[in-house]
């Protein structure tokens, strides 16, 4: 497969839509030549997460210093926690001849899309928005995680409704109704789009 290493793949969508599961399945497909750009965050580490594998867990002070030093390709703050993608992660992945996959929230994705558009480099982005089959199914997925209170779940659902409204900023939209079909559709999109570069 012909690959342009300056390309970025952005996978985004509401919290609870299955981005993490989809991402892990995509990464198993070695033919795609993608590697996950690990995000940095200030949120509390979940019991099954590992620093440097799932996220780079930073203090608020460390995160703010990196913002000041322009070390992020994108960053945002949600539910009192900072999230961002370090430029060094992107460069590291590209130096290994892989395409960085960013699994990020819609605010971060929107910031990157606007930044690339302003620089006339939108063609370097492959943007994919993952949709839930319905808001009710999204609510069920979030509840099954057992990590949020009812208030937090309702906040996430309200945020999801707003995020879905910007889905057309993304080149592709895929509904995660059936996980295997969703992943297969995204694999086809990535293979086809990367060959165009």
UniProtKB/Swiss-Prot annotation:
Coiled coil: none annotated. Keywords: ATP-binding, Cytoplasm, Kinase, Nucleotide-binding, Transferase. Its main location: cytoplasm. Residues 6-191 form the Guanylate kinase-like domain. One of its GO terms (cellular component) is cytosol. ATP binds at residues 13-20. It is found in: Cytoplasm. Gene3D superfamilies: Guanylate Kinase phosphate binding domain, P-loop containing nucleotide triphosphate hydrolases. It comes from the Bacteria. InterPro entries: GK/Ca_channel_bsu, Guanylate_kin-like_dom, Guanylate_kinase, Guanylate_kinase_CS, P-loop_NTPase. One of its GO terms (molecular function) is guanylate kinase activity. Transmembrane segments: none annotated. It catalyses: GMP + ATP = GDP + ADP. Its EC number is 2.7.4.8. Belongs to the guanylate kinase family. Essential for recycling GMP and indirectly, cGMP. This is Guanylate kinase. It comes from Mesomycoplasma hyopneumoniae (strain J / ATCC 25934 / NCTC 10110). The gene is gmk.
